[in-house]
UniProtKB/Swiss-Prot annotation:
Domain remark text: The N-terminus of the protein extends into the stroma where it is involved with adhesion of granal membranes and post-translational modifications; both are believed to mediate the distribution of excitation energy between photosystems I and II.
Record has S-adenosyl-L-methionine as a keyword: no
Binding site for chlorophyll a 3: E238
Keywords assigned by UniProt, alphabetized: Acetylation, Chlorophyll, Chloroplast, Chromophore, Magnesium, Membrane, Metal-binding, Phosphoprotein, Photosynthesis, Photosystem I, Photosystem II, Plastid, Thylakoid, Transmembrane, Transmembrane helix
Its biological purpose: The light-harvesting complex (LHC) functions as a light receptor, it captures and delivers excitation energy to photosystems with which it is closely associated. CP29 facilitates the State 1 to State 2 transition, where State I is induced by excess photosystem I (PSI) light and State 2 is induced by excess photosystem II (PSII) light.
Organism, as annotated: Chlamydomonas reinhardtii
Record InterPro entries: Chloro_AB-bd_pln, Chloroa_b-bind
Induction: Repressed by high light intensity due to a transient decrease in mRNA stability. Also down-regulated at lower light intensities by low temperature or limited carbon dioxide supply.
Protein name: Chlorophyll a-b binding protein CP29
Entry keyword Transit peptide: no
Binding site for chlorophyll b 3: S183, E199
PTM section of the record: Reversible phosphorylation plays a role in the State transition process and determines the affinity of LHCII for PSI and PSII.
Length: 280
């Protein structure tokens, strides 16, 4: 008895043999979708949530995220707006059997930080205010960025660590290998006059935004003068680098206290310790 089976589609018979050709399968191409806005390289997705300084924390109500680099970091509440309690007058009746003390009538919140040009040494009306903290952080961060870069460049070009830079100046002022006809006292006075004059001029500005970002000649390439969104991104990048620079220069100081070396010297000692298997 011989059984015959039906030939499946796509089967070709040749000389008593059977070769099965698989039928093409319909494939569906999946297209990756993203809810974020692509503004970077491959795989980049813009974070849409509220970026905070620590996960699972809540943002203080006085930090609304409108400032560049605002990540809700104020664990001590230093920038919280001041509140004043209005208490009524006590009943000072010496003939009464009992005098009631004044009760709380209202709680008044202080006005936002105001800048006055009358007092150029302390222009802000609120010492512990968000506007003043913001300006101080930005100015200190800019100095820290200059200091970190300046220390590395000076050590690499002169071989003198930033810790010993003051001692070198006592032997005689020089710049780019050229001797300067100034004593250390004269250089201090020149620095005080130039830097102090610049600070007095800056404190004459009553606009808090222009005090931090004057623009004009300080933005010769017009990087942030027209596009507000781009300007905000640049301000955020600046404050991030400023914070890193402040932490870095603090590290410079710790290294100098522990090793007695500058930035490059401490790095060389660290590398030698790793190569010799001594660790830190």
């Amino acid at each position: 008895m011989v059984f015959k089976f039906p030939t499946p589609p796509g089967t070709q018979k040749k000389a008593g043999t059977t070769a099965t050709k698989p039928a093409p399968k319909a494939t569906t191409k999946k297209v990756a979708t993203s809810t974020g806005t692509r503004s970077g390289g491959v795989g980049y997705r813009k974070y849409q949530g509220d970026a905070l300084w620590l996960p699972n924390t809540t943002r203080p109500e006085w930090l609304d995220g409108s400032l560049p680099g605002d990540r809700g970091f104020d664990p001590l509440g230093l920038s919280k707006p001041s509140e004043f309690v209005v208490i009524g007058v006590d009943e000072n009746d010496q003939n009464a059997a009992k005098n009631n003390k004044g009760s709380v009538e209202a709680i008044v919140q202080a006005t936002p930080d105001e800048v006055s040009s009358e007092n150029r040494l302390a222009p802000y009306s609120e010492v512990f205010g968000l506007a003043r903290f913001r300006e101080c952080e930005l100015i200190h961060g800019r100095w820290a960025m200059l200091a970190c870069l300046g220390a590395l460049v000076a050590e690499a070009t002169t071989g003198v660590s930033w810790v010993e830079a003051g001692k070198v100046e006592l032997d005689g002022a020089s710049y780019a290998g050229l001797s300067l006809p100034f004593s250390i006292t004269q250089l201090i006075w020149i620095e005080v006059i130039l830097v102090g004059g610049a600070e007095f001029y800056r404190n004459s500005e009553t606009n808090p935004e222009k005090r931090c970002y004057p623009g004009g000649v300080f933005d010769p390439l017009k990087l942030a003068s027209e596009d507000e969104e781009r300007a905000f991104r640049l301000k955020t990048a600046e404050i991030k680098h400023a914070r890193l620079a402040m932490v870095s220069f603090f590290g410079y100081g710790v290294q100098a206290l522990s090793t007695g070396e500058g930035a490059l010297g401490s790095l060389a000692k660290f590398a030698d310790g790793l190569n010799n298997g001594k660790g830190l």
